[in-house]
Amino acid sequence: MKIDVYVDIFAFFFAAGARKTVRYAASNDTATPHWKRRKMNDHTRFQPLGGNEMPRCGGIATMMRLPHVQSAEGLDACFVGVPFDLGTSNRTGARFGPRQIRTESVLLRPYNMATRAAPFDSLQVADIGDVAINPYNLHDSIARIEVEYDAILKHGCKPITLGGDHTIALPILRAIHRKHGKVALIHVDAHADVNDTMMGEKIAHGTPFRRAVEEGLLHGDKVTQIGLRGTGYAAEDFDWCREQGFRVVQAEECWNKSLAPLMDEVRERIGDTPVYISFDIDGIDPAYAPGTGTPEIAGLTVPQALEIIRGAKGLNIVGCDLVEVAPPYDPFGTTALLGANLAYELLCVLPGVTYRD
């Protein structure tokens, strides 16, 4: 009896250790359990787990049901969650964004039918989990995020971040700067996020790009902000951005038109400069994305959001984020579903992605 128990315990820990070394790849074999079937050599690229291998109601909720790995080593790109909302000024809940975005990503498939992008044909991509932020301390969380992104970037991996509130853009940009120097920025948002302080605090979700300019992280003449709108305290709210050289595209300029011509201008403006894309879900109209902390009416449409991201194809993208998804304010998961799709679209425009004929 005791011997059987010891054998079972040994088998459990042996299997747990073995699972850490599993490599994944697509397969048409449906008779063998997927975790065995997908063990391959080191040259095999990871693939999302398909609906014919595991029902979409099953499996572990990673982004696109990709493998979860412990670090960015050996990856070309990674999905990483930052479950943080200590910097919010209105409705909290963005800390649950990464988890819900992963859950709603279950229907995403590897091939982009519209653009013909096939990111998993050429890039090694995985979900590396979440940054272990400190839910009791904003400044400690910022430091932790910087450390984690330094570790990601040292491997040459491009992070696609699932937020989390927009405060996280600052520590990410600091790490990006240490790796790439000053970068260009495409910033989609209802708000400029260039407040000097919020309730006396220098670091919050409304201040990251003011700090980024002050710290010399951005090329001001290569920054484009799209979708800004709503009420403010003074005209200076947006004028400060223009004084730094930013191209400010208010939402009213986007109404009832394609944004493809705008993205032609953005690509010309940025050229081959390394660029970071920061996409706040509240840039999109709350009719499509109600689950966010600071909604503003009359925003961008979903097709316009796709035009912006797809229009970034060909740029030297070094990282991107999708932030401010707050699931508690959207019981149907629509906002997180949109966020998951936009994160996938960001993956599809990274350098090195192949396109099938």
Enumerate the language-model features and the residues they cover.
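Catalytic cores of soluble, metal-dependent hydrolases
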Residues: 35, 41-78, 91-92, 96-160, ...
